[in-house]
Amino acid sequence: MEEQQAAAAGGGGGGGGASMCANGCGFFGSEATKKLCSKCYRDQLKAAPSSPPAAPDLVANEEEEASTAAAAAADEQLALCSSGCGFFGSKETNNMCSKCYRDHLKATSPLFSSSSSPATASTTDITVPIAPATTAPTPSLKGKEEEATAAASSSAAAAAKPNRCVACRKKVGLLGFECRCGGTFCSTHRHADKHACTFDFKKSDREKIAKENPLIVAPKITKF
Protein backbone atom coordinates (compact mmCIF):
# COMPACT_ATOMS: atom_id res chain seq x y z
CA MET A 1 0.00 0.00 0.00
CA GLU A 2 2.82 2.38 0.82
CA GLU A 3 4.46 1.74 -2.53
CA GLN A 4 1.14 2.25 -4.36
CA GLN A 5 0.61 5.52 -2.51
CA ALA A 6 4.15 6.55 -3.39
CA ALA A 7 3.48 5.67 -7.03
CA ALA A 8 0.25 7.66 -7.02
CA ALA A 9 1.99 10.59 -5.42
CA GLY A 10 4.76 10.40 -8.04
CA GLY A 11 2.28 10.21 -10.90
CA GLY A 12 0.32 13.12 -9.55
CA GLY A 13 3.47 15.14 -9.15
CA GLY A 14 4.33 14.97 -12.82
CA GLY A 15 6.79 11.97 -12.88
CA GLY A 16 10.14 11.22 -11.20
CA GLY A 17 13.37 9.28 -11.54
CA ALA A 18 12.10 5.99 -9.92
CA SER A 19 11.77 2.96 -12.27
CA MET A 20 8.98 0.45 -12.24
CA CYS A 21 9.41 -3.13 -10.92
CA ALA A 22 11.01 -5.51 -13.45
CA ASN A 23 8.26 -8.10 -12.83
CA GLY A 24 5.62 -5.62 -14.00
CA CYS A 25 3.63 -5.70 -10.79
CA GLY A 26 3.03 -1.97 -10.96
CA PHE A 27 5.21 -1.02 -7.99
CA PHE A 28 8.48 0.81 -8.08
CA GLY A 29 11.80 -0.99 -7.91
CA SER A 30 15.30 0.08 -6.89
CA GLU A 31 18.90 -0.69 -7.75
CA ALA A 32 19.45 -2.21 -4.29
CA THR A 33 16.81 -4.88 -4.94
CA LYS A 34 17.86 -5.56 -8.56
CA LYS A 35 15.15 -3.22 -9.95
CA LEU A 36 12.45 -5.17 -8.13
CA CYS A 37 9.98 -4.03 -5.56
CA SER A 38 10.38 -5.23 -2.03
CA LYS A 39 7.69 -7.94 -2.33
CA CYS A 40 9.02 -9.41 -5.57
CA TYR A 41 12.60 -9.33 -4.25
CA ARG A 42 11.55 -11.21 -1.11
CA ASP A 43 9.68 -13.84 -3.17
CA GLN A 44 12.73 -14.29 -5.41
CA LEU A 45 14.95 -14.91 -2.38
CA LYS A 46 12.54 -17.50 -1.03
CA ALA A 47 12.38 -19.33 -4.41
CA ALA A 48 16.19 -19.43 -4.81
CA PRO A 49 17.69 -22.90 -3.93
CA SER A 50 19.63 -22.99 -0.65
CA SER A 51 23.33 -23.86 -0.67
CA PRO A 52 24.17 -27.39 0.52
CA PRO A 53 25.38 -27.50 4.16
CA ALA A 54 28.71 -28.97 3.20
CA ALA A 55 30.76 -26.99 5.71
CA PRO A 56 28.85 -28.14 8.85
CA ASP A 57 29.11 -31.76 7.70
CA LEU A 58 32.84 -31.40 7.22
CA VAL A 59 33.23 -29.85 10.68
CA ALA A 60 31.20 -32.65 12.24
CA ASN A 61 33.30 -35.27 10.46
CA GLU A 62 36.53 -33.64 11.65
CA GLU A 63 35.27 -33.48 15.26
CA GLU A 64 34.25 -37.14 15.11
CA GLU A 65 37.66 -38.16 13.79
CA ALA A 66 39.42 -36.10 16.49
CA SER A 67 37.32 -37.68 19.26
CA THR A 68 38.01 -41.16 17.87
CA ALA A 69 41.75 -40.49 17.83
CA ALA A 70 41.65 -39.12 21.38
CA ALA A 71 39.74 -42.18 22.59
CA ALA A 72 42.28 -44.47 20.93
CA ALA A 73 45.17 -42.57 22.54
CA ALA A 74 43.43 -42.76 25.93
CA ASP A 75 42.98 -46.52 25.52
CA GLU A 76 46.67 -46.86 24.75
CA GLN A 77 47.61 -44.79 27.82
CA LEU A 78 45.18 -46.63 30.16
CA ALA A 79 46.76 -50.02 29.70
CA LEU A 80 46.42 -52.53 32.53
CA CYS A 81 49.26 -52.92 35.01
CA SER A 82 51.90 -55.40 33.86
CA SER A 83 51.94 -56.96 37.33
CA GLY A 84 48.35 -58.13 36.86
CA CYS A 85 46.92 -56.31 39.88
CA GLY A 86 43.92 -55.05 37.90
CA PHE A 87 44.77 -51.34 38.02
CA PHE A 88 45.86 -49.20 35.09
CA GLY A 89 49.50 -48.50 34.39
CA SER A 90 51.37 -45.94 32.32
CA LYS A 91 54.49 -45.76 30.20
CA GLU A 92 56.22 -43.49 32.74
CA THR A 93 56.01 -46.26 35.37
CA ASN A 94 57.01 -49.15 33.04
CA ASN A 95 53.37 -50.10 32.38
CA MET A 96 52.76 -50.52 36.12
CA CYS A 97 50.38 -48.88 38.52
CA SER A 98 51.79 -46.49 41.10
CA LYS A 99 51.72 -49.04 43.95
CA CYS A 100 53.42 -51.83 42.00
CA TYR A 101 56.00 -49.38 40.64
CA ARG A 102 56.81 -48.18 44.18
CA ASP A 103 57.14 -51.76 45.42
CA HIS A 104 59.38 -52.53 42.45
CA LEU A 105 61.64 -49.59 43.32
CA LYS A 106 61.85 -50.69 46.96
CA ALA A 107 62.85 -54.21 45.94
CA THR A 108 65.40 -53.27 43.27
CA SER A 109 66.88 -49.94 44.36
CA PRO A 110 68.91 -49.91 47.63
CA LEU A 111 68.93 -46.10 47.65
CA PHE A 112 65.16 -45.96 47.96
CA SER A 113 65.11 -48.29 50.97
CA SER A 114 68.11 -46.61 52.64
CA SER A 115 66.58 -43.16 52.21
CA SER A 116 63.44 -44.27 54.01
CA SER A 117 65.17 -46.17 56.83
CA PRO A 118 66.95 -43.18 58.52
CA ALA A 119 63.66 -41.39 58.85
CA THR A 120 62.15 -44.27 60.75
CA ALA A 121 65.28 -44.70 62.83
CA SER A 122 65.33 -41.05 63.79
CA THR A 123 61.71 -41.15 64.81
CA THR A 124 62.19 -44.21 66.99
CA ASP A 125 65.32 -42.88 68.73
CA ILE A 126 63.57 -39.81 70.14
CA THR A 127 63.07 -40.08 73.89
CA VAL A 128 61.11 -37.67 76.02
CA PRO A 129 62.56 -37.00 79.49
CA ILE A 130 60.05 -37.39 82.29
CA ALA A 131 60.38 -35.06 85.24
CA PRO A 132 60.42 -36.81 88.63
CA ALA A 133 57.29 -36.46 90.66
CA THR A 134 57.60 -33.90 93.43
CA THR A 135 56.48 -34.90 96.89
CA ALA A 136 55.17 -32.53 99.52
CA PRO A 137 57.72 -31.85 102.26
CA THR A 138 56.86 -33.53 105.53
CA PRO A 139 57.13 -31.50 108.73
CA SER A 140 60.38 -32.14 110.55
CA LEU A 141 60.68 -33.29 114.15
CA LYS A 142 62.16 -29.93 115.04
CA GLY A 143 59.00 -28.14 113.93
CA LYS A 144 56.87 -30.49 116.01
CA GLU A 145 59.04 -29.85 119.06
CA GLU A 146 58.71 -26.07 118.60
CA GLU A 147 54.92 -26.32 118.38
CA ALA A 148 54.82 -28.43 121.55
CA THR A 149 57.05 -25.92 123.38
CA ALA A 150 54.84 -22.97 122.33
CA ALA A 151 51.70 -24.79 123.51
CA ALA A 152 53.33 -25.58 126.86
CA SER A 153 54.44 -21.97 127.37
CA SER A 154 50.96 -20.64 126.58
CA SER A 155 49.40 -23.04 129.08
CA ALA A 156 51.99 -22.03 131.72
CA ALA A 157 51.22 -18.35 131.15
CA ALA A 158 47.54 -19.05 131.58
CA ALA A 159 48.24 -20.91 134.80
CA ALA A 160 50.46 -18.07 136.10
CA LYS A 161 47.77 -15.46 135.52
CA PRO A 162 47.23 -13.43 138.71
CA ASN A 163 43.98 -14.24 140.51
CA ARG A 164 44.09 -11.46 143.15
CA CYS A 165 43.13 -7.80 142.97
CA VAL A 166 46.17 -5.53 142.59
CA ALA A 167 44.65 -2.85 144.85
CA CYS A 168 43.22 -4.85 147.78
CA ARG A 169 44.80 -8.25 147.17
CA LYS A 170 41.38 -9.84 147.27
CA LYS A 171 41.18 -13.23 145.63
CA VAL A 172 39.10 -12.88 142.46
CA GLY A 173 39.78 -16.15 140.60
CA LEU A 174 38.26 -16.25 137.14
CA LEU A 175 35.88 -13.35 137.87
CA GLY A 176 38.58 -10.67 137.93
CA PHE A 177 38.46 -7.63 135.68
CA GLU A 178 41.49 -6.80 133.52
CA CYS A 179 42.21 -3.13 133.13
CA ARG A 180 43.89 -1.61 130.09
CA CYS A 181 46.81 -0.68 132.29
CA GLY A 182 47.60 -4.39 132.61
CA GLY A 183 46.36 -5.19 136.14
CA THR A 184 43.56 -7.45 137.40
CA PHE A 185 41.05 -5.96 139.83
CA CYS A 186 37.96 -6.91 141.76
CA SER A 187 34.53 -5.45 141.14
CA THR A 188 35.21 -2.60 143.58
CA HIS A 189 38.51 -1.42 142.08
CA ARG A 190 37.90 -2.25 138.42
CA HIS A 191 37.29 1.36 137.33
CA ALA A 192 40.21 3.65 136.55
CA ASP A 193 39.29 6.18 139.27
CA LYS A 194 39.31 3.44 141.94
CA HIS A 195 42.92 2.41 141.44
CA ALA A 196 46.12 4.07 140.32
CA CYS A 197 45.53 3.50 136.61
CA THR A 198 48.39 4.56 134.33
CA PHE A 199 46.55 4.18 131.02
CA ASP A 200 45.66 7.44 129.16
CA PHE A 201 42.11 6.84 128.01
CA LYS A 202 41.72 10.33 126.50
CA LYS A 203 44.75 9.96 124.30
CA SER A 204 43.60 6.52 123.18
CA ASP A 205 40.14 7.87 122.34
CA ARG A 206 41.61 10.80 120.37
CA GLU A 207 43.79 8.46 118.32
CA LYS A 208 40.83 6.17 117.70
CA ILE A 209 38.60 9.05 116.55
CA ALA A 210 41.36 10.43 114.31
CA LYS A 211 41.90 7.01 112.79
CA GLU A 212 38.22 6.43 112.13
CA ASN A 213 37.62 9.97 110.83
CA PRO A 214 40.61 10.97 108.71
CA LEU A 215 40.91 14.60 107.68
CA ILE A 216 40.22 15.03 104.00
CA VAL A 217 41.80 18.12 102.47
CA ALA A 218 41.15 19.07 98.88
CA PRO A 219 44.24 19.73 96.76
CA LYS A 220 45.15 23.33 96.19
CA ILE A 221 44.07 24.91 92.93
CA THR A 222 47.01 25.90 90.80
CA LYS A 223 46.46 29.23 89.09
CA PHE A 224 47.88 29.72 85.65
UniProtKB/Swiss-Prot annotation:
Residues 47-68, 112-142 are annotated as: Disordered. It comes from the Eukaryota. Keywords: Metal-binding, Repeat, Stress response, Zinc, Zinc-finger. It holds the Pfam family zf-AN1. The keyword Transcription does not apply. Zn(2+) 4 binds at residues 179, 181, 195, 197. SUPFAM superfamilies: AN1-like Zinc finger, Glucocorticoid receptor-like (DNA-binding domain). A zinc finger (A20-type) spans 15-49, 75-109. A zinc finger (AN1-type) spans 159-205. May be involved in environmental stress response. This is Zinc finger A20 and AN1 domain-containing stress-associated protein 12. The gene is SAP12.
